[in-house]
């Protein structure tokens, strides 16, 4: 066997369909070269690595600070609570805090994340520094002048960014990505966001059926963050965000965790919450926790020819070996402690 070649056997969840198959996966120089079926037997589970489709990890420096008042008083730029805290935090403390959070995501099998990075060019550079040398890579969506040195722009809302048209024009001219918060507290900014044909919408918690139909028709993915929506008080019902309606209309949903100050960026917890509160089927939930990887250009699904980005989960040391439905067990019970190996392309 080539020194750059590795063969991993397990019950793998193959392709976007997450078809459960006992296989031997041959990885050579970071690429999945061959997936070969083998005889069924007791095997570890092999799953795609996860992608956190929406974060604000810098505000983790204010982790679990008491949050009172309306959402806009907490997170809206430029004078919301989180922005005041970020401005007052020394740069090295921000970098150290972000690196700790990225390391926590890495330990949980999260290979990448899309972060709305405040603070202009220095903010983008701080996140790049924080992620240096780690295998959990950011898609950085900058603000306040940081858009063109990042992977693109992360817009707080189409209704509260002065000169948004000019920002979008610059981003598009540079061939960068455009992501916009929309419909988090009401549907009033969704239509305006859609006029910019974004590459990603975040939240859509209160988007109307007509708006969701338009989003589906345009093929724009939606990063939903239900735990954050509940914590910030913009929902108290399984009807919001309207996950079932999104799926029925053909929307492509991704899963994010939003503000680290309020929510641990752990997609295992997010998946379990969605399963419990919204009752979606396990395959839909797990697929949404991986699909955001398309933002990197190389999705993490397990297919021949793609970069190898997958997790080996051993159910044997815990009671997970009792599972009659491994995919449901992954969504509702698994976590970082069950991961015994990560196969990650460089």
Task: Identify the role of each PLM range.
Residues 84, 88-89, 95-97, 114-199:
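Metal-coordinating catalytic core of metallo-dependent amide/deamination hydrolases
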Residues 10-11, 25, 30, 43, ...:
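Divalent metal-coordination and catalytic microenvironments
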Residues 291, 304-346:
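C-terminal cap of metal-dependent C-N hydrolases
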Residues 44, 55-83, 99-113, 124-141:
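Catalytic pocket of metal/acid-base enzymes, prominently hydrolases
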Residues 60-96, 191-196, 216-222, 274-280:
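Active-site gating loops and adjacent loop-to-helix segments of metal-dependent hydrolytic enzymes
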Residues 187-301, 313-318, 333-335:
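Active-site-adjacent C-terminal substructures of enzyme catalytic domains
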Residues 49-51, 178-179, 253-255:
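Residue-level marker for buried hydrophobic side chains located in beta-strands
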């Amino acid at each position: 066997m080539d020194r750059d070649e590795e063969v991993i056997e397990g019950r793998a969840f193959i392709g976007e369909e997450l078809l459960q198959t006992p296989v031997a996966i041959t990885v050579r120089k970071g690429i999945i070269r061959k997936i070969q079926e083998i005889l069924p037997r007791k095997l570890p589970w092999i799953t795609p690595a996860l992608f956190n489709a929406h974060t604000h990890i810098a505000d983790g420096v204010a982790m679990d600070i008491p949050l009172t008042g309306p959402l806009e008083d907490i997170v809206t730029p430029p004078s919301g609570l989180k922005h005041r805290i970020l401005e007052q935090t020394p740069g090295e403390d921000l970098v150290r805090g972000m690196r700790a959070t990225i390391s926590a995501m890495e330990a949980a099998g999260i290979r990448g994340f899309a972060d709305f990075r405040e603070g202009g060019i220095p903010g983008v550079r701080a996140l790049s520094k924080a992620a240096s040398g780690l295998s959990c890579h950011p898609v950085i969506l900058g603000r306040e002048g940081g858009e063109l040195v990042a992977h693109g722009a992360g817009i707080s809302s189409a209704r509260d960014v002065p000169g948004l048209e000019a920002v979008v024009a610059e981003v598009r001219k540079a061939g960068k990505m455009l992501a916009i918060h929309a419909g988090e507290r009401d549907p009033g900014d969704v239509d305006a966001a859609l006029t910019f044909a974004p590459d990603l919408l975040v939240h859509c918690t209160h988007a109307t059926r007509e708006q969701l139909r338009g989003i589906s028709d345009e093929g724009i993915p939606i990063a939903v963050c239900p735990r954050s929506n509940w914590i910030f008080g913009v929902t108290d019902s399984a009807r919001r965000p309207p996950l079932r309606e999104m799926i029925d209309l053909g929307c492509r949903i991704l899963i994010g965790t939003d503000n680290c100050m309020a929510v641990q960026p752990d997609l295992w917890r997010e998946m379990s919450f969605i399963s419990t509160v919204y009752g979606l089927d396990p395959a839909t939930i797990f697929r949404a926790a991986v699909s955001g990887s398309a933002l990197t250009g190389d999705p993490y699904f397990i297919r021949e020819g793609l970069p190898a980005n997958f997790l080996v989960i051993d159910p044997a040391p815990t009671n997970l070996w009792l599972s009659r439905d491994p995919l449901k067990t992954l969504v509702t019970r698994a976590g970082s402690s069950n991961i015994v190996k990560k196969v990650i392309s460089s």
